[in-house]
Amino acid sequence: YKTASRKGEPFEQLIFGWVNPYLPNQDHRICTIELKLRTSKRYMLKTLGIKKWGAAIGIRADEAHRQSKTKDPRITPFYPLIEANITERDVLDYWKKSNFDLRLENPAMGNCTGCFLKSEKTRAWICKNRPKDRDWWLEMEKRANATFIKGVSWKELNDFAQRQGEFSFDD
């Protein structure tokens, strides 16, 4: 916790660590592959010397459609939140009662604030309400001369969001 990156440094190193800068996207989720899957695999194999292991995947019951089979025979995935029927509401209630504040003004935020898998509505909310986060995503696209999402840049989304009035999207 004390040494955790707070400003996207590992992600930025991933983007600009190639011969040509490369932005992760829906077709090539190199962020998941490199920062999660291959990193944990290297740790298990090289650091711990473990040849087969189980992997707890944090997918909730209300997002069970996201489950997938691993192609790696060394890994047995399991989904404890699905098995326990834990939903987003349960998770939010847990964090409200916790002494640790995640500082998520919007439940859809998570730690990858501008993930290309988030809805356009959520990303537009970030443009209006989280300027530091927005600016980081804008800067990555500018430096890489590419976009995370085919057909719409963070700059275009931000320009659109800034032109809009204040609307409440709460139910």
Task: Briefly describe each language-model feature range.
Residues 1-171:
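Nucleotide-activated chemistry modules centered on ATP-dependent adenylation/adenylyltransferase
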